[in-house]
Amino acid sequence: MYIGEQLGDLSDRKLTWAAQLGVEHVAVNTLKDTGIQNEDGTWNVPPIRALQRRLAEFGITMDVLNLGIEAAYYQRQRFPDLWTGGSGRDRAIDLLVQNIRAAGEATVPCLKYNCNVIGILRTGRTPGRGGATYSHFDVEKWTERSLTPLGPMPAEKLWENAVYVLERVVPVAGQCGVRLAVHPHDPALPREDGLRGVHSILGTVEGMKRWIRAVDSPYSGFNFCQGTVAEMCRDPRTEVLEAIRYFGREQRIFMVHLRNIKGGYLNFEEVYPDNGDVDFYEALRVYREVGYRGMLCPDHVPHSEADPDNERQHSFALGYTKGLIDALSRS
């Protein structure tokens, strides 16, 4: 396993910064200004290869490319009908299949995506170390309780929709040699009633297990967001390690978002990697134990007025992670 970075900025300056920090593998989050995506959403193979060559000039390999299925509120997504079962679902699937084939032709090893209808929810910020602030979620402080225009979206309806999609895209991914890495639901929603009538089928470890069984393939796995998994747990310190062990042994962890929280299920704040409830040294020890060989990427970081673009925060997270990897290698 090794450090990686998620890049939404592909400028020379940003790539130089990443290379100087020892980053040799990245997930590309943006298609903007790359020429990869046409106006109709379909992808072109030559610009993907051109981007791979450009990254290589900085000593960087593209391990993962963003498939473009966002975690935003469904009405703001490019494919609002995909997980909701709307009339545009089949057209969206056809386009995604075409893009998976393009990724395979360009030898992109992995595509990441989200299964989220209601978006990433937070309720504010809390004071943190040295004047930084932490993103916070407390379900008791969430004020919008009305149903979305979708009406009630119980878990089984969402499962039916998800399996419909997976049955059509996962076999294609397997044929093309492209792994599909889904992000768990951030945050977990109340398990009994959901929120605004919407349930989160990837908001529990059991839901994640069901996902990989639904269309069982070595090409269907996770962008394993360790922070999001911690948000599902009542005891993140122990439960996160158990989840790493389970999905790692199943070889369904395709990349890792490495971030830490304080708190847990329905009430948490996103903190620095070294001051949360999950022991990162122990977490990395378990990744090594199960044979994980992919990227460990910083994800959400605290905000600092002294670091408006979060570059120093990411630098700290990368260096901290690299130090832990090196320490483990000598143990």
Model segments located where?
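Basic, amphipathic N-terminal segments that precede the first structured/catalytic domain
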Residues: 18-35
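Short beta-strand and adjacent tight-turn residues that come in two discontinuous sequence segments
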Residues: 28, 113, 297
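Short, well-structured secondary-structure segments
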Residues: 25-30, 63-64, 181
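Structural motif corresponding to the early beta-alpha repeats
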Residues: 32-163, 174-175
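Histidine-acidic metal/acid-base catalytic patches
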Residues: 1-4, 9, 14-22, 53-57, ...
